[in-house]
Structure formats: C-alpha cells, structure tokens
UniProtKB/Swiss-Prot annotation:
CDD domains: ASKHA_NBD_HK_meta. Catalyzes the phosphorylation of various hexoses to hexose 6-phosphate. The keyword Chaperone does not apply. Residues 63-195 are annotated as: Hexokinase small subdomain. GO terms for molecular function: ATP binding; D-glucose binding; fructokinase activity; glucokinase activity; mannokinase activity. This is Hexokinase. Belongs to the hexokinase family. GO terms for biological process: glucose metabolic process; glycolytic process; intracellular glucose homeostasis. PROSITE patterns: HEXOKINASE_1 (PS00378), HEXOKINASE_2 (PS51748).
Length: 451
C-alpha cells in the first residue's frame, strides 16, 4: 500500500504523540520533583530520593565587592578550561584570560591519576604561557559531576556522568586528587573551593544581580543549584549561617520510577544503549548530550517502518551519537516553508543519499517534538524550585549551549515556568555566561568571608 505524504506525516504525529505532554502532565512532574527534593534534604529519607540535594557548603554568595586575582578550573564535559580571573569590585566587570583544552578520550576513560595529571599539566602550561608561574594563587575548581561535599575542599565523587569513566576517582575527594598533582609540579596554587557548575552559575549571576537565587545549566548535561534555608537541610550538621546553596543533581530525577509513565519507547531504547543505563533519566530527556541521539533512535524506527528514506537506513545513522544535538538547533532555525538546514543536515552531515521533501518535514517535526519536551521539562523543574523557595522576586542565572544557542528553548522553557510557578512570584531568566569560570573564582574570593 502506498501512502501519500500527508498520510505519512500523520502516522509520524501519532507515533510521536507520547512526546506531546499536557500542562497537567508537567504539573504532576513538577509535584513529583518537589517531593523528591523534600525527601532528598532529609537524612532519614535521602536514600528514597533520586534527587540527592547535596549541600555545597557555600553559605555566602558573592556580592560584587570581591577583589583580587584568582584561578579557576572548569571540568564538566569534553572541553576543559583554565582561567585567570581578576575581580575589581563593585561596578567593574572581571578581567578574564582563559584557554580551552580538549580532554582526550583515553583520559576520560583511563585512570583517575592520568586525568588529574593532565589537568595539572595544562594548568602549568597556562601559567607558563601567561607569565604567572611564580605567582601564588587561590583556585576555585568547578567540577560538574555528582559529589557529596563535607566542606568547600572536600568533594567526593559519587559517580561519573557525561561520558567519563576514569577509574580511581569515584568515592575519592577530587580536591585532594587535584592538589596532589599540583603539588607534584611545585605549583604555588591552592584549591580553596570545589563547586558545581550550577553553583558557579548562581555565584556569577549574583555578582551582578542580588536577586539571583537559582543557577541552572542546560548544556551537555543539566543541573540546578539554589539558595535554601539552612534549617531545612538535615544533611549538613552544625550550620551557623541562615542559608546554604544546594546542588540538587536533578539530572538523576526519574531513577526511582518518577518519570516512567512519561518515558517513551525511544527514551527507553536510547537509555539501554547509553553508557549508564537506568541513570540520569531526567537529564537524558532534557540535556544536549542526549537529544540528538534520541532523535536518531526515532529516525531509525521510522526507517524500519518504511516511513523515512524509503526504508533505507544510511550507514552514518547506524552509528551511535552520529546525530549531534547542534544539528537540532540548526534544524529549528529553518522557516516552516523552507527546510534548507534540515536538508543539509541529512544530505551533507548524515550522508542520506536521497532526501524527499516529506523526509525533511518529518525529521524537522521529530527534532521539534524532542526539544519542545526538553524545554518544557526544564521549565517544570524551575517552577518546582520557585515553589520551594517561595520568594516574591527571583532571578535565575542560566548557562549552557542548549539554552544559549537553540532559537526556541528559552521561550518554551519560560512559557512552562509561567504556567506552573507560584502566582505571587516574579521571575527573570538571565544569561549567566562563564559561571563555571567567573563564578568559581568569585567563590574562591569569598571563601575567607565564610571561613
């Protein structure tokens, strides 16, 4: 039986209907996340929660008065940065020198010693090239992986995410592993704070906006940090300060089954093929590391159903992670009547030999549905945080490639926050670029205030 283009498209709409959640669905997800966060903050129920709500031990966020020269390391994905940040006080933007290094695959999956040796070597290289090797520095280390913190310089890695699997690091204090390698090279550098990139994003935004109480990352991964009332944090003993920044690690939401009724067949098949099946399920529905792969799984299925590409799957699309999330950003820049980016992606990037107009339309729709759900899920998460802190006015500092570069992600996320937030709360999403660099340096600068 031969189907018309419109019939094929209608079949795709039906197949992808599970991605099209209602506001009631997102309300329920928001409620479930709130309950997971409540459980995560209590000692007696933390094990029952998929969201671990780690105290960051940052009890004073920067206020813009900090001054001095500090170093920051930013490790949170395949690209790793070394920064020199000069803070010049109120009203002045920090001066930043930085260099980006690509972490070799063998360092990501080899030994932890080799990974931290590489980090120390690149830091030494940076200092040498900038004439700073003989100077003394305090350093803020942005380490964007799930950690249990017992202090600003005691962060134990719970588990690797985002493609890392270096052994000998899980269960160990990453500040100590870093400091050991720095000391071996006789660098006059002291790691004074380990922070998550979301904590850094919050701190960076707080330098310029005192209403900032939330830091959000939507990039390779996703996570959020926020300022919590210390009296509600049982996980942290003997807190004297009234507030503490919580690193939620919300990417793990769903690991206790909270998202099962909304996970599609494609979410499940992608998860099974992933490096850590059953883990980081919310992150796998929201973040840039997974959305392209999710679309690839959809395309493979549609080819198997003889809906796409005349049933012929190109070799390139048989390869895991061959469909990059940045392609999704390009695709949604296309006007609805002229899908030239979509066509280019399929023909030039993915080597599909024959692409019909209906193929472009279907692939564009799949990309749109996947990213739309991701943005709405992120929005439901932010609404959950706003409900929790219940302030009249809140700035959310946001960073991450998906948020920054996708043409519709911010708009969609904002739309869902608006629908689910407390009625008496006004919020503002503010781009907080370089939070993991500038923010980590600012926290290093403010450490003396809280010690």
């Amino acid at each position: 039986m031969v189907f018309s283009d419109q019939q094929l498209f209608e079949k795709v709409v039906e197949i992808l209907k599970p991605f099209d959640l209602s506001v009631v669905d997102y309300e329920e997800i928001c409620d479930r996340m709130g309950e997971s966060m409540r459980l995560g903050l209590q000692k007696s129920t933390n094990e029952k929660s998929s969201i671990k709500m780690f105290p960051s031990y940052v009890t004073k966020t920067p206020n813009g008065t900090e001054t001095g020269n500090f170093l920051a390391l930013d490790l949170g994905g395949t690209n790793y940065r070394v920064l020199s940040v000069t803070l010049e006080g109120k009203g002045k933007s920090p001066r930043i020198q930085e260099r980006t290094y690509c972490i070799p695959a063998e360092k990501m999956s080899g030994s932890g010693t080799e990974l931290f040796k590489y980090i120390a070597e690149t830091l030494a290289d940076f200092l040498e090239n900038n004439g700073m090797k003989d100077k003394k520095f305090d350093l803020g280390f942005t380490f964007s992986f799930p950690c249990v913190q017992k202090g600003l310089t005691h962060a134990t890695l719970v588990r690797w995410t985002k493609g890392f699997s270096a052994d000998g690091v899980e269960g160990h204090n990453v500040a100590e592993l870093l400091q050991t390698e720095l000391d071996k090279r006789e660098l006059n550098v002291k790691c004074v704070a380990v922070v998550n990139d979301t904590v850094g994003t919050l701190a960076s935004c707080a330098l310029e906006d005192p209403k900032c109480a939330v830091g959000l990352i939507v990039g390779t991964g996703t996570n959020v940090a926020y300022i919590e009332d210390s009296s509600k944090v049982e996980l942290m003993d003997g807190v004297k300060e009234p507030e503490v920044v919580i690193n939620t690690e919300w990417g793990a939401f769903g690991e206790k089954g909270e998202l099962d009724c909304w996970r599609t067949q494609f979410d499940k098949s992608m998860d099974i093929d992933s490096l850590h099946p059953g883990k980081q399920l919310y992150e796998k529905m929201v973040s840039g590391m997974y959305l392209g792969e999710l679309v690839r799984h959809i395309i493979v299925y549609l080819v198997e159903q003889k809906i796409l590409f005349r049933g012929d799957l190109p070799e390139r699309l048989k390869v895991r992670n061959s469909l990059l999330t940045r392609y999704l950003t390009d695709v949604e820049r296309d006007p609805a009547h002229l899908l030239y980016n979509t066509h280019y992606m399929l023909t030039d990037d993915l080597h599909v030999p024959v692409v019909e107009p209906i193929d472009n339309r279907i692939v564009r729709y799949a990309c749109e549905m996947v990213v739309k759900r991701a943005a709405y899920l992120a929005g439901a998460g932010i609404a959950c945080i706003l409900r929790r802190i219940n302030r009249s006015e809140v700035t959310v500092g946001v960073d991450g490639s998906l948020y920054k570069f996708h043409p519709k992600f911010c708009e969609r996320m904002t739309d869902m926050v608006d629908k689910l937030k407390p009625k008496n709360t006004r919020f503002c999403l503010r781009l907080s670029e370089d939070g993991s660099g500038k923010g980590a340096a600012a926290i290093a600068a403010s450490c003396t205030r809280q010690n």
